[in-house]
UniProtKB/Swiss-Prot annotation:
Principal EC category: transferase
Protein name: Queuine tRNA-ribosyltransferase
Residues annotated as catalytic: D90, D262
EC number: 2.4.2.29
GO cellular component: cytosol
Positions annotated to bind substrate: D90, S91, G92, G93, F94, D144, Q185, G212
Pathway(s) this gene product operates in, as recorded in its UniProt entry: tRNA modification; tRNA-queuosine biosynthesis
InterPro entries registered for this protein in UniProt: ArchSynthase1/Queuine_TRR, TGT, TGT-like_sf, tRNA_ribo_trans-like
Similarity-based family: Belongs to the queuine tRNA-ribosyltransferase family.
Record's function text: Catalyzes the base-exchange of a guanine (G) residue with the queuine precursor 7-aminomethyl-7-deazaguanine (PreQ1) at position 34 (anticodon wobble position) in tRNAs with GU(N) anticodons (tRNA-Asp, -Asn, -His and -Tyr). Catalysis occurs through a double-displacement mechanism. The nucleophile active site attacks the C1' of nucleotide 34 to detach the guanine base from the RNA, forming a covalent enzyme-RNA intermediate. The proton acceptor active site deprotonates the incoming PreQ1, allowing a nucleophilic attack on the C1' of the ribose to form the product.
Source organism (scientific name): Acidithiobacillus ferrooxidans (strain ATCC 23270 / DSM 14882 / CIP 104768 / NCIMB 8455) (Ferrobacillus ferrooxidans (strain ATCC 23270))
Amino acid sequence: MSIFQLLARDGAARRGTIRLPRGTVQTPAFMPVGTYGTVKAMSPEELKTLGAEIILGNTFHLFLRPGLEVISAVGGLHRMMHWDRPILTDSGGFQVFSLGALRKLTEAGVQFRAPTDGHMVFLGPEESMQIQAALGSDIAMVFDECTPHPASYEEARVSMELSLRWAARSHAAYAGPGELFGIVQGGMYADLRRRSLAGLQRLDFPGLAIGGLSVGESKVEMMQVLDDLMPHMPADRPRYLMGVGTPEDLVEGVRRGVDMFDCVMPTRNARNGWLFTRDGVLKLRNARYEKDVLPPDPACACYTCQNYSRAYLRHLQRSHEILGARLNTLHNLHYYQELMAGLREAIAAGRLDAYADDFYRRRRAGSLVGA
């Protein structure tokens, strides 16, 4: 039985649910990123209040610090984090890809020096599956190679075929409590993406992700990959666009049939003083906000906007106060969760195009863009 239930469609966009043992996730969904077992500056209770039903943990970083021995000793990742809802863990493939020349790639896997202390580490499909099983992931991801950009056709083909072989090994090795998703690779090449998808479908994964995007390609290239690939994705499985992205990326991904997203953008930008609003991005360091008594977004119902001014948040940002990072993060995650809720409601009502038109109209007309 599929873990995905389709509730409504509007064009290619889907409104549905993903049923997991620790809870049901309403889709389209955005997953806040908790790299080291914490969504930076947020408590689990705050995440729940904001509407987060699933978060992302990072296999690579958690394996290196605090390590599986510590996580197992305290009862697993959920108990350690005090989070009783679903967690998706990535496989570590993207982080290994990010090491560049510091890694040695073979058919068996990847050898690299740990950025924490320099000791040699080997990570392959079997090791990644063992780690994710020990973490107790509700959704684990196959170990893959993130195809670099730009890549020639031959480079993308070789990388994609390696990822398919690793997917088969991941599938055979995984014995965790959760679901295991496959990852479509193939760079910017439509036929390679379709070949990757076909190979993954033969392994019958309960969900499929689109990897290898948001790695330096243009927005036009990203959307072209989705336009080529999404019509071929199975309708009865959740579809996860990895590491993407901006509010515009979320709207366009949903319009093309994506169900799940994750990105560090709302939390990272919050720490840098960039706040997402319905009218664009508010950059707190701009001197125009020095004496501004308005909240970041007067129409926003989040705790930050209900209680604090742009002037105060700017002061906290310039003073490097921890409270500023917390208030900014709370606002940005509220914005992202509200955006997803609005998209879900629009799909259910059959008015997604009107919702998207209003989204872009407000951002074009807003006085905050580039501020």
